[in-house]
């Protein structure tokens, strides 16, 4: 029987980050995603969900109108399926909005790793990428009037940036190499 804790979907789908395999940490293959929220103006429900591939650093942004965990899980699942995103694992923080994400992981047939409380450095790729998003949407700015097409443009700009870590290739160049 499942306990009432939403995180505890089962003992095989939702795992602590300490059990994440080393090969995921090495960033050798695409499909291992980090997911986080980017909050807007205080006292507003609207926020962004950022999804970042650990290997290629590809960014996807989703506008979220509510911080409800089931709404968020459904929103992420639908976005991943609609955009045919390659998913092999998911890593998230302990935010309340992600407590039902185990359901999404189970539907996708992947493992969900949750970080330790107050350890955002365990999702460093995501945190670094969120800082790039903040160049376009400063902290405290309302997300209410940001249409998805604007967020897609931000993703395109960030994904098109040459990165020193990749010998000045952009995300799209890397994906061409990986998905030949």
Functional labels for PLM-detected ranges:
Residues 36, 51, 57, 76, ...:
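Mobile genetic element proteins and their domesticated derivatives, centered on retroelements
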Residues 75, 102-104:
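A short acidic, amphipathic alpha-helical/loop segment
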Residues 1-48:
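Mobile-element integrase/transposase regions
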Residues 85-100, 118:
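Acidic/histidine-rich, metal-coordinating catalytic segments
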Residues 56-60, 82-88, 136-137:
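Short, surface-exposed connector motifs at secondary-structure boundaries
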Residues 40-41, 66-69, 95-98, 120:
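Short, catalytically relevant binding-site loops at active-site mouths
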